[in-house]
Amino acid sequence: MKSRAAVAFGPGLPLEIVEIDVAPPKKGEVLVKISHTGVCHTDAYTLSGDDPEGLFPVVLGHEGAGVVVEVGEGVTSVKPGDHVIPLYTAECGECDFCTSGKTNLCVAVRETQGKGVMPDATSRFFVNGQPLYHYMGCSTFSEYTVVAEVSLAKINPQANAEQVCLLGCGVTTGIGAVHNTAKVQEGDSVAVFGLGGIGLAVVQGARQAKAGRIFAIDTNPSKFELAKQFGATDCINPNDYDKPVQQVLVEMTKWGVDHTFECIGNVNVMRSALESAHRGWGQSVIIGVAGAGKEISTRPFQLVTGRVWKGTAFGGVKGRTQLPGMVEDAMSGKIELAPFVTHTMELDKINEAFDLMHDGKSIRTVIHY
């Protein structure tokens, strides 16, 4: 099958819109026609060359929504015509991780997914006869993609695909981090470092949890209006102070903030977020992905005196069983998605979407096919 796709032929190069060949789905696989895909910082991170798992040439994209076209042998959970969201965090329901009840980090396809291939260790994408790598098990920058059955969430066909595609990554990650990882309670204080799509989703999740003070922190004050719309009570630009932002937050709260979230991927900000956490019980959740080889540091005393450092992937959400419910929440208005979509454009303009993101002019650009 022929498909239009935005292909990354090398690190740091603009994506090229080309026609590729997509092979049929094999056993346990599904062919999906993508209708919409968000452009996420993780795509830009891999494209930059900083991602230690980055492989080229590759079809990027992992925040999409579409419709099942064809299923491979043995596929029973979806059928042609079903509306789906591809998952970069699979859920097989059978591995040690899935059955533990402790994590969403399924390992069913992790090894091959990290190598940019399907579970049988081969690709379904080709250009001029040469294979292309898959990306995060999704590759939503192709109009047609092949995904493992365990990496697909079946959703309500009435859902707005332009909006719910964002539940494939950023919004789910942020909201899930609040409810699943941090378990924010009513009245707790929350500080969010970085007000991109994930950070704003954390703010929204904190409001859902009925948090008390919600501190929104960013060096780009143009993000503050939307943060307030989502529920932030205090907006802080670290550049406005002549002292570290963690000192500012501790002084504003007496002992620190109950829950802090790092949504950037900057190891220095990760330290600031931890050191802003409340003495005795504060916890800091790392969501942002740092560059290859980066390490985090703090004084052990910060942990000895009761602070906890945590991390989360996909907000602790189990995609196949829990994401459909989040789609329903979006349809009912419990999760607000429309404000995240600041730009929409066709695939041909996808490089403009990356420019908008790098310039801090967008929250999410959604590509439609």
UniProtKB/Swiss-Prot annotation:
List the Gene3D superfamilies: Medium-chain alcohol dehydrogenases, catalytic domain, NAD(P)-binding Rossmann-like Domain
Cofactor binding description: Binds 2 Zn(2+) ions per subunit.
| Necessary cofactors | Zn(2+)
Quote the EC number. Answer: 1.1.1.284, 1.1.1.1, 1.1.1.-
UniProt keyword annotations, A-Z: Cytoplasm, Metal-binding, NAD, Oxidoreductase, Plasmid, Zinc
Q: Name one GO biological process term.
A: formaldehyde catabolic process
Question: According to the UniProt record, what class of enzyme is this?
Answer: oxidoreductase
Q: Does the keyword Metal-binding apply?
A: yes
* Function, in words: Has high formaldehyde dehydrogenase activity in the presence of glutathione and catalyzes the oxidation of normal alcohols in a reaction that is not GSH-dependent. In addition, hemithiolacetals other than those formed from GSH, including omega-thiol fatty acids, also are substrates. Also acts as a S-nitroso-glutathione reductase by catalyzing the NADH-dependent reduction of S-nitrosoglutathione.
Family, as annotated? Belongs to the zinc-containing alcohol dehydrogenase family. Class-III subfamily.
Q: What is the protein name given in its UniProt record?
A: S-(hydroxymethyl)glutathione dehydrogenase
Question: Which species?
Answer: Photobacterium damsela subsp. piscicida (Pasteurella piscicida)
The organism's lineage?
Bacteria, Pseudomonadati, Pseudomonadota, Gammaproteobacteria, Vibrionales
